[in-house]
Regions:
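Membrane-embedded alpha-helical bundles that constitute the cytochrome b-like, heme-associated redox core
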Residues: 2-254
Length: 254
């Protein structure tokens, strides 16, 4: 079985995840930017719409948008960089991965700042929900795995032995996967929190703005599932290709 045959499922799952990404992004932008008032009762404010300023009571929608793009788009693309055979063959995968990771880190930092400012403005309580606790743990994992990989493969690469880089790389990959799925789970949990707040505030359960953020969470889950399939099939292709190369070397030796 040739490696090109095994790479076909990787490409399918990678592009499927990107389709889900685009749908998620469209729903996220629609929810955060378009919906700011309930369409049936203009006097009823809803949890959606960035009609206000950065630090106003409705400014926490920046948190939703920035964190959604950070983990739903940037982190997803950083993972998919290593599922691309062309990027890996040209040696660009590491740098594309690093670029998307840096973008995700900047967006996540801005998203954290926006929710702190918005909560301070509205005198809302901090750190009382499952979403908040999971968010802090996810960001801590993000920072650790980012600088771990940066030190191992960029800053101190020339000073580390190949064995050390391999060991550090193993932990970086493990932490990276954990961070990605922790981020997806935290985002989905955040959407669930919003849905409860929206319904509790009197907004209809099946209102268009309520459903927009609900389906955004669903497509974010679809995206992460497709990424998992892409990573799994990519690893399978690597193992089989390595096995074929070793068999070929043994045949030549014989």
């Amino acid at each position: 079985m040739g490696s090109h045959t095994l790479n076909a499922p990787v490409r399918v799952f990678s592009w499927t995840s990107r389709v889900f990404e685009l749908v998620f992004l469209a729903l996220l932008i629609t929810f955060c930017v378009y919906f700011s008032k309930d369409k049936t009762d203009p006097s009823l404010a809803v949890y959606g719409g960035m009609s206000g300023c950065y630090n106003c009571d409705n400014g926490w929608n920046w948190h939703v948008l920035l964190m959604g793009i950070a983990f739903g788009i940037a982190m997803t693309e950083s993972v998919l960089a290593f599922c691309s055979s062309s990027l890996r063959a040209n040696g660009y995968a590491k740098w594309v991965h690093l670029a998307w990771q840096a973008i995700a880190l900047i967006l996540a930092a801005a998203g954290l700042a926006s929710i702190i400012v918005a909560k301070n403005y509205s005198d809302s309580k901090h750190m009382y929900s499952v979403h908040a606790y999971c968010g802090v743990l996810t960001l801590a994992l993000f920072v650790i795995q980012f600088f771990w990989g940066l030190c191992a493969f960029v800053l101190f690469r020339s000073r580390l032995s190949e064995a050390t880089r391999y060991q550090m790389g193993t932990y970086h990959i493990l932490l990276g996967k954990l961070t990605y799925y922790a981020g997806i789970g935290t985002c989905v949990n955040g959407f669930a929190d919003m849905q409860m707040m929206m319904v509790d505030s009197g907004q209809p359960s099946y209102d268009s703005s309520t459903m927009a953020q609900s389906w955004a969470a669903v497509f974010l889950w679809f995206t992460s599932a497709a990424v998992f399939c892409a990573m799994t099939t990519s690893r399978t292709a690597e193992v089989v290709t390595d096995s074929e190369e070793k068999d070929a070397e043994n045949n030549v030796a014989v």
